């Protein structure tokens, strides 16, 4: 029989993946210290930062349709990463049973796992999370560069959120080529940029909840 905790995690990840419009403000109960506690702290910090940034954006951009019910939801990681699938608990990572199918250990260099040694499936999960963070970090940086050109100087991205993303990426420590995005000068429509900011913040908060729950699961495993 599959462990109940793994099934609960799976149902949560699937729900987050398919129902992005839900409000998920509640955090998980505190877990005991474990090998993944370092990244759990970073993920909790990230969730707080993106929640605060989203709240400020909704207040500042109240006339820009910035609520979850008003925006058109968009996932910039779609067809590029597969975090929900990659982060399935090992007990559920087989086709016909709940037995662990892969026990191969890999050496990782990040601080998310204190031992530096983790399973193949866990490494895939952390790698996918890293790629998610990298895509959002690049997108937010490019968007902030546009907002800095806005004569109204109405809103900018909270540097605490960008720093929280960077900290978790550094803790994961996967080497991946990064191509900085530059703001497009062809279409400098600041209204569209602010609407897009709302869309991205809502999507990223959902992803931050998913990441936080995965880190909680890993830290208590």
From Swiss-Prot:
The keyword Signal applies. Keywords: Cytokine, Disulfide bond, Glycoprotein, Growth factor, Secreted, Signal. One of its GO terms (biological process) is immune response. One of its GO terms (molecular function) is interleukin-12 receptor binding. Pfam families: IL12. GO terms for cellular component: extracellular space. Glycans are attached at residues 41, 95. Disulfide bonds join 39-112, 66-198, 87-125. It is found in: Secreted. Residues 1-25 form the signal peptide. Heterodimer with IL12B; disulfide-linked. This heterodimer is known as interleukin IL-12. Heterodimer with EBI3/IL27B; not disulfide-linked. This heterodimer is known as interleukin IL-35. Interacts with NBR1; this interaction promotes IL-12 secretion. Heterodimerizes with IL12B to form the IL-12 cytokine or with EBI3/IL27B to form the IL-35 cytokine. IL-12 is primarily produced by professional antigen-presenting cells (APCs) such as B-cells and dendritic cells (DCs) as well as macrophages and granulocytes and regulates T-cell and natural killer-cell responses, induces the production of interferon-gamma (IFN-gamma), favors the differentiation of T-helper 1 (Th1) cells and is an important link between innate resistance and adaptive immunity. Belongs to the IL-6 superfamily. This is Interleukin-12 subunit alpha.
């Amino acid at each position: 029989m599959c462990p109940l905790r793994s099934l609960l995690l799976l149902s949560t990840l699937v729900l987050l993946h398919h129902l992005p419009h839900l409000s998920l403000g509640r955090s998980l109960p505190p877990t005991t210290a474990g090998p993944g506690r370092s990244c759990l702290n970073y993920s909790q910090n990230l969730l707080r930062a993106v929640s605060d940034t989203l709240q400020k954006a909704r207040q500042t951009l109240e006339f820009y349709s910035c609520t979850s019910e008003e925006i058109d939801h968009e996932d910039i990681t779609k067809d590029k990463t597969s975090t929900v699938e990659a982060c399935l608990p090992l007990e559920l990572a087989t086709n016909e049973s709940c037995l662990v199918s892969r026990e191969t250990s890999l050496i990782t260099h990040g601080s998310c796992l204190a031992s530096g040694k983790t399973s193949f499936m866990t490494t895939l999960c952390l790698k996918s999370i890293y790629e998610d963070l990298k895509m959002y970090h690049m997108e937010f940086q490019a968007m902030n560069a546009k907002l800095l050109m806005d004569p109204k100087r109405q809103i900018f991205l909270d540097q605490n959120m960008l720093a929280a993303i960077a900290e978790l990426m550094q803790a994961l420590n996967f080497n991946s080529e990064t191509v900085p995005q530059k703001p497009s000068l062809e279409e400098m429509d600041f209204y569209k940029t602010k609407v897009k900011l709302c869309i991205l913040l809502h999507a990223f908060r959902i992803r931050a909840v998913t990441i936080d729950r995965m880190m909680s699961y890993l830290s208590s495993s």
